[in-house]
Amino acid sequence: MNNGFFNSDFDSIFRRMMQDMQGSNQVGNKKYYINGKEVSPEELAQLTQQGSNQSAEQSAQAFQQAAQRQQGQQGGNGNYLEQIGRNLTQEARDGLLDPVIGRDKEIQETAEVLSRRTKNNPILVGEAGVGKTAIVEGLAQAIVEGNVPAAIKDKEIISVDISSLEAGTQYRGAFEENIQKLIEGVKSSQNAVLFFDEIHQIIGSGATGSDSGSKGLSDILKPALSRGEISIIGATTQDEYRNNILKDAALTRRFNEVLVNEPSAKDTVEILKGIREKFEEHHQVKLPDDVLKACVDLSIQYIPQRLLPDKAIDVLDITAAHLSAQSPAVDKVETEKRISELENDKRKAVSAEEYKKADDIQNEIKSLQDKLENSNGEHTAVATVHDISDTIQRLTGIPVSQMDDNDIERLKNISNRLRSKIIGQDQAVEMVSRAIRRNRAGFDDGNRPIGSFLFVGPTGVGKTELAKQLAIDLFGNKDALIRLDMSEYSDTTAVSKMIGTTAGYVGYDDNSNTLTEKVRRNPYSVILFDEIEKANPQILTLLLQVMDDGNLTDGQGNVINFKNTIIICTSNAGFGNGNDAEEKDIMHEMKKFFRPEFLNRFNGIVEFLHLDKDALQDIVNLLLDDVQVTLDKKGITMDVSQDAKDWLIEEGYDEELGARPLRRIVEQQVRDKITDYYLDHTDVKHVDIDVEDNELVVKGK
């Protein structure tokens, strides 16, 4: 080929390039680098000679270490069990497990399933907090003590975390390889029993999708479980067992269910007594028997959404930790560190022949040692029932107090406190007070709400105000009142506002603003159904269950407890009854609006009477007290004459409308006029209110 590219010029360039390359290969032109640093040929030769004697030995050691690592990864199945699990039986031998009390029946059933020849795989099914894991630990202790069938007397229970099997499996087949090593490890040991907590996670665990061909953990374990080659203990909740395990019939038949129920209050007290020593040693706090019983009783009453014994143990642990933090105990670590520093200083002083200084240091060391020894016993805090009440109050926000003399007097005087705020409605106040006293003293049946009442009567007589005052007096906060205006619940879809929508409807996953969710978050509340006669009949049907059984099931199937609430319904039905109306007249009026089974659920139906002028005298004093509270923020005092009060009552009295017109008059004639006077006299410190020429006047000082 002859073209313009392959010409004589190109040939000369090529020959010159080849000559340069040959020159670079000469010894004098070679360059050597070690770890990125240029070295001379002489230095390279010296380093090579020094390393030649050790190279063979190092290579042999490196090969041996690599072989050991490979054997540990592939063939060391016994070590693999130790890497991914905890040997509960060994921990029981070492005394590291807490004692298990009152679970002999469940432990015996689990041991019987394990001793079977095939399908020897028990699964503990129970709600969260009832002690499923503790039963497995109790079984490990029973194996150590020899209180199990002969077939499992040599078994070792290995607790395996499923996530540890998935960790680091970034390549196809790595997860399956881990499972095979686990199975081979169990086979080779011949006495290992695997314990999977939250065993429902094995469904789909490790699978990467139906199209990839990757198998999940449950699919790999099924053949080995069926043949009895491995034995597994599982633990899960009722919901997870139903939603995951039972859907896989092949997996379900390989397990034998052991039902774990919540222990009784008596058994829970015994459980706390069994673990008391561990908590006392950990927190350095004494825990008497009455404290243990209070943990159980108060947790049952005030933490209904959780189960025993978990909630009682948590209350005990939190109380002991709080007392330990508050106790002026000696910091053991800091004291021992200080003693060590002084020992060094003493040795230096002796070396320097400063014997007087060394003697002083020795005295300080002895003082610290005595202080450390005394701190182990003399300064140990002792828990009381009041401490348990404080813990419950911190957890729930409810002002829990021990039933002492002061609290008994407070319960006795609850009607007087309410009567001072609710004027002219003594019958309603007394009925509500009796229900509260009965509940707080512990003499009600405990299943129904604290009280359920129907307040009927004209507008403006204190029905809603009584509900507000109850929330403040019982729960210390007016925000504990859940008020529902029944005019918003009159349509056919109103039920979804109460319990949330059911599956298949929009908003199923968002029930945050429903009544059931509000009660779940704040179980100690006063629930006010205002103007109940306007509600849809389906709402009244729901209330039948609440007032009778004390619970309600929301749209997602959760059972909400209402037994710590007070239910108050208000109605204007019976408005025409006068002060002398009998109870049968009230019931006759109520039957026009409500079904008999609804009325029969209430603890009491109370008619609120019309307010007379004598009652308004007390009401106007309360309204003026509210005005004074506002003036206190400005540093202003107020004095209202009796003539001014009488004038306000005359102007604001309306028998049909109750106290609301009086409130409006106080707003217009007192608050507004004080505001106008203050804007003209910003330095005022005192105001007098009186009547002149049939008008209210404000004078300041």
Curated annotation (Swiss-Prot):
Q: Which GO terms describe its molecular function?
A: ATP binding; ATP hydrolysis activity
GO BP, one example? cellular response to heat
Q: Where is the composition biased (Low complexity)?
A: 49-72
Q: Which InterPro entries match?
A: AAA+_ATPase, ATPase_AAA_core, Clp_ATPase_C, ClpA/B, ClpA/ClpB_AAA_lid, ClpA_ClpB, P-loop_NTPase
Q: What keywords sit in the KW lines?
A: ATP-binding, Chaperone, Nucleotide-binding
Q: Where is this region: I?
A: 81-332
Pfam families recorded: AAA, AAA_2, AAA_lid_9, ClpB_D2-small
Q: Describe the location of the UVR domain by residue ranges.
A: 336-371
Binding-site list for ATP: 126-133, 457-464
Q: Which family does it belong to?
A: Belongs to the ClpA/ClpB family. ClpL subfamily.
The protein here is known as ATP-dependent Clp protease ATP-binding subunit ClpL
